[in-house]
């Protein structure tokens, strides 16, 4: 079996409100931000964007098994909004690499520089660079020029060449670099600078699909499915044979030199002749002086809202609702190594916390990946948003037998408008806190990441200028190896009567609802948002949970996230197709013994999005499990039991039901948003029958 291979993929979306025709939600009606003619609407993006991702996955032959989808829009002031008119569309994946190949080797004098893959085209010119420019009417032409084109077939050919080289007894590739932002103008200098070398490049040797391209366009375009790599001259014949066997284009475009000079030339003239130090020399740190102030934290009053109305709205919010329309368009089993995709249980409910694949066809060990993001919190407290995103990603994969938390590796993608000193300050402090306060204390690493610091769009509308910028957004992807795939726990209640459902509180009893799905759908300015209360206690929880997984004492596991505790419980009931009785004990949650005021607390308790987990435990292990968590300072509460009807009932502290409804009815509401998009995108009759 291949030692070096790509495995599975992930895909995520942040967009502004969808405003689906004939299905416009109450929280969308009062925020009506238009779009300039040059950009697609959020609904158009969510109809066409996922099709692009899934078709590429299908053509390339890798399953997309994980992701997220968030819509967000909020008015800041007149003509100024938070939102994702400049959307976040994140794609990534997981792979395995043998320990003989993970380090790049030293490029030496006269080693060949090769471009592998497709030709240069006048597409994506300034693409990655343009993503770091604020969008406005003045650069509308660049907006269109920045659009890149995909070619999954070419990518697969490149992958086969790389696989053959990396899985041979001796890898003839010395060093390799994918061509991304900046095109060859970035990839070539970087690959030689890593080895303190220079390079002489013949621009005429760079493959071009369009012979009219200028030297600048050849050098800077960001045509996809290309790699820059270095090999020894003596290995050129072998490399050529591999490329011919895979029908993959390549060209020797130059060679490395000792003189640390970058030269781009043709037979008649030199276009670039620069010392490498000029490109990569140390720059002084930018100093920004900001008069910061303490974040004003004031909670909102939810006592006047009806519980059922809140639940209906929250279940309809895209961040909470079913993501089925994003999933069924892709092949999730290609390659034959998928262990867990987005769908859970025999009823195939899309609520998976993580994606899991096997290493090989023995299906003994494998890999897990998950995602975490809390962008809606960032408009209140960017630092808390970053910390919560990391912890959410880790909680999402905690249901897999990972073992030591230090085995988890994170990827961080940072998005910000970065257009004022406060945004810069908040981004800096968030990055500082995520690394020093969270990752260092957990013992996990963030070896990779990306950023886009231009998440703002402005345009003229009549005599007004409209501005839409994104919150400071951190998207965290978590990856780890899994040992013993038979021990993975699913977010699905098992129909075992002699069991209890416990809530594991990782927020020390806090019930802050700022930045929650609830505050978004009710359009409430709630300035008290969730935070990571005790990161060392969080680490202890992870370690203890891993022990319980290995000893097979957990029946189901689902972390509390968008929508809060109530949606966590309901989703697990959907997947298991079982009913649940939920118990609200006044003493446990430290409320006043006043039955009239008790119901005012229900909404905050059930809809807050503090860190927490719901587990189903067999009653024979219940006391032991609660004791183990108690010993590390974590409180757990028996929150629910299974019932014989497919319905949810919530009991107050007097054991009187105050809420009861059919889970089938809630499931239809939860699925409605996905259905409405499918109805527009796909055959409407097929969507209706489904």
PLM feature segments, named:
Residues 1, 5-690:
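Glycine/proline-enriched, intrinsically flexible loops and inter-domain linkers
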